[in-house]
């Protein structure tokens, strides 16, 4: 079994923007200066602008998209997973040495194979019906 800790970035810096521009230019085989407008938009909107205050929240949302892909991919490979949100990010950050970094623990996911001795693994799963959960309007 493995415990995967997914991290979110707390802020976006000019160095992050430069890295994105360089990577984009390289991938697209274009001159980086052709992306100056894009780089300026990132600076004005996401680094210096009011949206800089919500980057951490946005980054957390992006982590959950990655988590969804992790859960789906693992299921396709027959690997059991359990997403864990009820943990102490501060303690995980301390253990992982992230306290002074620009990254923060966001969600944890246990991955592995269930024990054949697990008496709960074969019990019927309790789920609400679609009618209980979905309202059509």
Where are these regions (language model features)?
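Acidic, surface-exposed loops and disordered segments
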Residues: 1-137
């Amino acid at each position: 079994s493995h415990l995967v800790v997914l991290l979110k970035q707390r802020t976006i810096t000019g160095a992050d923007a430069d890295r994105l521009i360089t990577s984009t230019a390289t991938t697209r085989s274009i001159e980086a200066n052709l992306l100056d407008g894009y780089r300026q938009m990132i600076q004005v909107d996401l680094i210096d602008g009011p949206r800089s205050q919500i980057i951490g929240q946005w980054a957390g949302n992006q982590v959950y998209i990655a988590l969804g892909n992790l859960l789906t991919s693992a299921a396709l490979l027959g690997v059991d997973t359990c997403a864990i949100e009820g943990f102490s990010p501060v303690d995980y950050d301390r253990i992982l040495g992230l306290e002074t970094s620009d990254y923060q623990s966001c969600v944890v996911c246990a991955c592995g194979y269930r024990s054949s001795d697990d008496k709960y693994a074969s019990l019927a799963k309790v789920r609400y019906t679609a009618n209980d959960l979905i309202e059509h309007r």
